[in-house]
Amino acid sequence: YTLMALTTAATVPVSQMLLRGYVISEISPVEAGWWEGMNRISHMYLMVITSSFSVYYLPRLSELKDSVEIKREIVKAYKVIVPMLLVAFTLVYLLRTVMIRILFTPEFLPMENLFFWQLAGDFFKICSWLLSFLLVAKSMTKAFVSTEVLFSLNFVILGFLFMRMNGVVGINQAYLVNYVVYLICMVFIFRRILYVK
């Protein structure tokens, strides 16, 4: 568990630091501020979701041994979480301008263009967490560390590529693509559990 926690603690800040540095040097410090602001909003609600997963979902997965029961728990989680996310993220998107005005100065209003891609990326991120938490619950350290490192690197590479085409919003687009692929990867890793009858 310690190694897994350390891996996440190392890969996430490093990837964000590399991308932030690129935005500052190649685009502008102002737009780097927009992206940082978007990250902070995202971090606030992701912390709440992570905490709730850690309190119930992770211990529940840890205690289950039978593949059928694990699948049932995962499906139940998706049935609860996905509709809630769709409603919550729709509200956040619709109220994005109000949120920016409350939390930041008017100079951050152009940040509203980042919301769609960030929210879509967070949706797939949370959906992938419902599976990746199984890596932690079953102490699949090698798979966890490998995927964390691989997808952090993938995010940085995609971020550089998308930014060259679309500017700072390219990071958020890369974030979405990265977590769609990550979710597919988690489905592949746990295919035997997910498709058990």
PLM features: residue spans?
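Membrane-interface junctions at transmembrane-helix termini in multi-pass inner-membrane proteins
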Residues: 120-150
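Interfacial segments at transmembrane-helix termini and the short loops linking adjacent helices
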Residues: 29, 75, 94-123, 169
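Membrane-interface helix-loop junctions in multi-pass transport and translocation proteins
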Residues: 98-101, 142, 152-184
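Membrane-water interface segments that mark the loop-to-transmembrane alpha-helix transition
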Residues: 67-91
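Residue-level recognition of pore/gate-forming positions within transmembrane alpha-helices
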Residues: 13, 40, 122, 148-153, ...
